[in-house]
Amino acid sequence: KGDASIPIDGLIWMVSIDEMKDRVRQKMQDGFTVLKFKIGALDFQSEYELLSQVRKEFGAALEIRVDANGAFEEKNVKGVLAKLDAINVHSIEQPVRPGQRKLMREICQETSVPIALDEELIGIHLIEDKVEVLESIRPQYIILKPSLHGGLVGTLEWISLAKEMGIGWWITSALESSIGLEVIARMA
């Protein structure tokens, strides 16, 4: 058995402040230094206050990522991103619904919070379509789920394109079985 490991992030769902702090403490005791918070389920001001308190208590030792699952709209997304920037959030996954490429490109260019495409990539299998989505949006990151991106070959195509375009990427799962998780781990 080797000493090498694959870094993973811990997932925190939005709940009460005390419960969230307990979960964050537990994750940090378990060795996590990167936590992803699901946002967009509550009103954003409440979520922002929760994230602000977590940032205040845990400081720079904790890398905060957020996943919005397309929860925000053109009228509020820039304000949301400005607030997330104020608390030094690492990145936000899919801030607006898929299919809004012009808006997504605009926020990728204008915000200092890096944008990660997630749901935007699902169902895109042809290489020319992959090139088109990445060139039209120019995200800072892409999130890859092999079971949703054509398996190993489709995922490796996304990785190759991302590298060519200077786009960061990471691999995650979409409720895979233990066999699927092993394949993802071997890819990482």
Predicted features along the sequence, with ranges:
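Metal- or metallocofactor-binding catalytic centers and their adjacent structured scaffolds
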Residues: K1
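Active-site mouth loops of central-metabolism enzymes
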Residues: A4-E19, I39, D67-E74, A116-D118
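Short amphipathic alpha-helical segments
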Residues: A4-I6, T33, L62, Q140
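Active-site glycine-rich loop that binds ribose-phosphate moieties when present
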Residues: D18-D22, E49-L50
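Short, surface-exposed amphipathic charged segments that create phosphate/polyanion-binding patches used
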Residues: R23-K27, A185
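Catalytic domains of carbohydrate-active enzymes, especially glycoside hydrolases
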Residues: Q26-K38
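Catalytic core of soluble alpha/beta enzymes
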Residues: L42-E182, R186
